[in-house]
Amino acid sequence: MATRHRRRGGSAPSWAKPGKPGERPGGPKKSRGRTSWKSLLIWGVFGVTLGLMAGYYLWGELITDDSVTEVLAAQRDAVAQRFFHVPCSQDYESLKQFEACTPRKCGRAVTDSVITLQEAEKMRRLAEAGLSLGGSDGGASILDLHSGALSMGKKFVNMYRFFGDKLKDVMSDEDFNLYREVRLKIQHEIARTFNISVSSLHLTKPTFFSRMNSSEAKTAHDEYWHPHIDKVTYGSFDYTSLLYLSDYSQDFGGGRFVFIDEGANRTVEPRTGRLSFFTSGSENLHRVEKVSWGTRYAITISFTCNPEHAIGDPTWT
């Protein structure tokens, strides 16, 4: 159900009143009447035009500022599966050579029935353990088990090089096996939903855990709230998935995922074990709200149709 909020007010523009028209020397009185009628008509058309322009501007402001919001999946709801179709953009023209993987339809999906609560809780513990070794000075920290990238202060380190064998005190082969099993489940669900070949879909980079809180941003990497298109920001993405590892309104405030559509913003409220996935093109412009309190955990798992952009599952070697 759409929730509509009051528009931000603003004083109407103040217009100067026209002065009293002067009389033309020797002109007949009816001429002055015709001039007055035309003047009123011109000012009327001008006023209507300005009104339409102002209305258009205010409507644009309304949408941009999240004033019209539809909740696609609330945290309190257990969602078996919901799919929301959106027209495909032109961003997939280069994928025609990968026919078995090219989107036959575009959209976004939400499900709470693919990843179990137990699996999600184990994934969160893995994220917490890895991020406990570092963490950003700002509000957003990442942990990439594939490349080893770990936020530390205002920079990133390669945790495999930085910590070496000490990492095995924090992570295990069992953790990596769980990671692979979760990834496979998500890959199969994306393929089933979009009616594409699961074998034509490849894990790609970056794929990473994220931890967000209300700390002030210290670098551009901490500014996670800007609207973006995944296929533009990360060129290899064709399908994006997010697995949420904490609960909106219980573990944190703010931090909802927002699809920015013409006419409304549509949100997904994170819930532990909730899987949200979508085609990565410009039909799915989106952003994440700033976290206002608490800590938000999630993992982004991305897929490509191009085998040249594929990466393997994380391993110790």
Swiss-Prot record:
- Write down the superkingdom of origin: Eukaryota
Q: Where is this region: Disordered?
A: 1-34
- Topology feature Cytoplasmic, residues: 1-39
What InterPro entries does UniProt report for this protein, alphabetically? OGFOD3, Oxoglu/Fe-dep_dioxygenase_dom, Pro_4_hyd_alph, Pro_4_hyd_alph_FE2OG_OXY
| Listed transmembrane segments | 40-60
Where found, per UniProt?
Answer: Membrane
Q: Which residues are glycosylated?
A: N195, N213, N265
Annotated residues for binding of 2-oxoglutarate: R296
Give the molecular function GO annotations: dioxygenase activity; iron ion binding; L-ascorbic acid binding; oxidoreductase activity, acting on paired donors, with incorporation or reduction of molecular oxygen
- Active-site residues, as the UniProt record annotates them: R296
UniProt KW Cell cycle keyword: no
Which segments does the topology annotation call Lumenal? 61-317
Q: Where is the Fe2OG dioxygenase domain?
A: 205-307
Give the cofactors, semicolon-separated: Fe(2+); L-ascorbate
- Membrane topology of the entry: Single-pass type II membrane protein
Query: What are the UniProt keywords, alphabetically?
Result: Dioxygenase, Glycoprotein, Iron, Membrane, Metal-binding, Oxidoreductase, Signal-anchor, Transmembrane, Transmembrane helix, Vitamin C
Q: How is the cofactor bound?
A: Binds 1 Fe(2+) ion per subunit.
Kindly list the positions annotated as binding Fe cation.
Answer: H228, D230, H286
GO CC entries: membrane
User: Record's family?
Assistant: Belongs to the OGFOD3 family.
Protein name (database record): 2-oxoglutarate and iron-dependent oxygenase domain-containing protein 3
